[in-house]
Amino acid sequence: MALYHFSVKQVSRGKGQTVVNSAAYISGQKLYNDYYGQTHDYTKKSGVVFTEILTPEYVPERLTDRETLWNEVEKVEKSKRAQLAYSFDIALQNELTLDENIELARAFCREQFVAHGMIVDLAVHEGKSKNEDEPDNPHFHVLAPIRPFTEDGRWGNKQKREYVLDEDGNRIKDAKGKDIFNAVSTTGWNDPELLKEWRRAWTEKVNEKFRECHMAARIDHRSYKEQGIDLIPTIHEGYEVRAMEKKGIKTIIGELNRAIRQFNQMFICLLYTSPSPRDRTRS
């Protein structure tokens, strides 16, 4: 069954996170972190089937090296609470082949992220399920520096000042005589409307592929509620339950949630059905 998931968060030093570690994790590689003087080794991680760094044409070749790229990002950010990168987690489709999923991810990143001037660290994970009663979870990760790299070959500013003006166009000052201003993004990458556009664009990209393959499956970036579909909500699992389930230890709450998801999937399958990659035919 075709499923939709598209989430984005920020990798933040203020939360004790490091983007070099994040990059090592999604790529399944061993990377040295200059900022902290330590190595992050995820070479034993399984399931990473494709990685690539995509950049605008003006970005120098050195930044296509993963370790170099993310160490530069760590170095240029001076604040102890710096926001380092956007981190995307996007579901791929079991109905499609691995090669089709990879090409979808690459094309989407080029069209929606790189086209906006973003440097993209892409990693595709096959997401093999550990439980026989749960489907595989193929997905891809994207890390993108929050600070832009400019066409003149340097790391640019994240924000700029927009001064508050009066009716005559003069700057308004505060009680201390200082100009009042708002700090705004230089890129617009954090604009909620742009995120909505990315979600919609991914939906269209996947559904276009389904149509090309003569498949009835479709995804929808809208919530089930917005689509008018009533599903049974799952039960909150909490840290301990999730940790046990991750280790392959089945729990009562986990079993209940699996049953709920299975019922919901059966319900949705009445609305969206498609043949497997092996069974479909192409004209």
Where are these regions (language model features)?
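N-terminal nicking endonuclease/strand-transfer module with a His-rich metal-binding environment
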Residues: 1-274, 278
